[in-house]
């Protein structure tokens, strides 16, 4: 038996789905993402949402201004699709290198998505243009019909919307973001090279029981919600399989502790500070360390047609206790009060 390594040196990873927020929260959470990742796809669901080239440029400038001295990090900006967004505005942003991709939020599916798309038919011209200019579409894949059980909303979205969309726009590059079900994983496996998916660390670690163990655990509440154990296991198999259609996307979504622990708690898990250590625990447990670099550092940029990072990071087998709360931030990190076996070296 090959002995377990004490150190891993990897091509620097990227995060293909992150919420950096804005203002004070941006300043608090950006260093954690920039420490672990060279680039990140930045979600546009601010208030107001990022729907124009000028808004994306301004947000990118705020991110760059908040970056601590000595840190190298590139934010990759996205456009927030609405029923009336202009195809010309999207094309201009993509041509000028401002918009890396466009994000489809079904209206009212998640945090700050009220201005999202009410019906895919409303954005047919937009999707036609995106397909023509080879601009990736990023999808929050859940239906919002109140008659559909919240645990079934991803699977129903595939049948109602994603399958027809792939048929109508077969040359459109699509990322099915933060997948949570075996149906989603299988849909991507069965798809073509223009279909990919991101997987979060928390959906690899927890199932829906975690939200209710020992009481109501608001820190494990996110959207899409965690599902049954069989879905978690299917995600672990997909992430660690070596299939290039799957890549890292944390969906790190910080909320102040007071916002999480309230009568109407916010959806989102803040996993950025220990994201790589969290993913690595899964790959090691599944006996798939040989596939970790591709998942974290190679599959994403290849799908987005971006260069691979040339610098490296080092992860060492050094146990670390994750704090119950991050000092001075009022944020509870994923794995709070747990011990992780790996540590990202400074």
Curated annotation (Swiss-Prot):
GO terms for cellular component: cytosol. Substrate binds at residues 19-21, 45, 140, 223, 255, 267. CDD domains: DHOase. Zn(2+) 2 binds at residues 103, 140, 178. PROSITE patterns: DIHYDROOROTASE_2. Its EC number is 3.5.2.3. Coiled coil: none annotated. One of its GO terms (biological process) is 'de novo' pyrimidine nucleobase biosynthetic process. The modification N6-carboxylysine is found at residue 103. Zn(2+) 1 binds at residues 17, 19, 103, 251. It is an enzyme of class 3 (hydrolase). GO terms for molecular function: dihydroorotase activity; zinc ion binding. Pathway: Pyrimidine metabolism; UMP biosynthesis via de novo pathway; (S)-dihydroorotate from bicarbonate: step 3/3. It catalyses: (S)-dihydroorotate + H2O = N-carbamoyl-L-aspartate + H(+). Binds 2 Zn(2+) ions per subunit. It holds the Pfam family Amidohydro_1. The keyword Chloroplast does not apply. Homodimer. Catalyzes the reversible cyclization of carbamoyl aspartate to dihydroorotate. This is Dihydroorotase. It comes from Synechococcus sp. (strain RCC307). The gene is pyrC.
């Amino acid at each position: 038996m090959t002995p377990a390594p004490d150190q891993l040196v990897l091509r620097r990873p990227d995060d293909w789905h992150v919420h950096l927020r804005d203002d004070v929260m941006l300043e608090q959470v950006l260093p954690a993402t920039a420490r672990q990742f060279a680039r990140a796809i930045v979600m546009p669901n601010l208030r107001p949402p990022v729907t124009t080239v000028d808004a994306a440029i301004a947000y990118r400038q705020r991110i760059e201004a908040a970056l601590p001295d000595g840190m190298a990090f590139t934010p990759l900006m996205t456009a927030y699709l609405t029923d009336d967004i202009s195809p010309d505005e999207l094309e201009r942003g993509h041509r000028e290198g401002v918009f890396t991709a466009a994000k489809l939020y079904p209206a009212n599916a998640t945090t700050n998505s009220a201005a999202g798309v009410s019906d895919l038919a409303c954005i047919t011209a937009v999707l036609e243009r995106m397909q023509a200019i080879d601009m990736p579409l990023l999808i929050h894949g859940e239906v919002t019909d109140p008659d559909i059980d919240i645990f079934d909303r991803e699977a129903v979205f595939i049948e109602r919307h994603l399958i027809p969309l792939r048929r109508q726009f077969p040359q459109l590059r699509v990322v099915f973001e933060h997948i949570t079900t075996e149906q989603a994983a299988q849909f991507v496996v069965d798809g073509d090279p223009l279909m990919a998916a991101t997987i979060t660390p928390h959906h690899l670690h927890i199932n829906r029981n975690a939200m209710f163990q020992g009481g109501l655990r608001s820190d494990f509440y996110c959207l899409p919600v965690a599902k049954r154990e069989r879905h978690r296991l299917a995600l672990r198999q997909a992430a660690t399989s070596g299939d290039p259609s799957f890549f890292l996307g944390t969906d790190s979504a910080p909320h102040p502790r007071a916002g999480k622990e309230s009568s109407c708690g916010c959806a989102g898990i803040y996993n950025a500070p220990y994201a790589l250590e969290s993913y690595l625990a899964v790959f090691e447990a599944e006996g798939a360390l040989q596939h970790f670099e591709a998942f974290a550092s190679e599959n994403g940029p290849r799908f987005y047609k971006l260069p691979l990072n040339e610098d490296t990071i080092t992860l060492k087998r050094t146990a670390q206790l994750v704090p119950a709360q991050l000092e001075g931030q009022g944020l509870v990190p994923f794995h709070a009060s747990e011990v992780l076996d790996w540590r990202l070296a400074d």
